[in-house]
Amino acid sequence: LTPSWDTDDNIFITAQASNITIANPTGTPVNGQTIMIRIKFNAVYTITYGTNYRAFVAALPTAGVAGKTLFLGLIANTTDTKVDTTAMSEV
């Protein structure tokens, strides 16, 4: 999965059926710009991230849980050239 600052506001994956890599976003971000990612997992799968992701409050999840939905909020931080990741929760 490669989010794009130029075209994505929300990304919905309704039946993730394999391991997933969330690559660094492409495009030109505006400082503070957001993208919300929602992924529902069919089984337990690993999650890996590009090198620009930075978690706040808790570590980024490394596995999806069968039958659960993961929410990730991405915030462009052009000052630090990072993707600040917030709003992590699994329901």
Regions found by a protein language model. Give the residues of each.
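Short carbohydrate-recognition loop motifs
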Residues: 7-13
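Acidic, glycine/polar-enriched metal-coordinating patches/loops
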Residues: 14-91
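Predominantly extracellular/luminal regions of secreted and cell-surface proteins
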Residues: 1-7
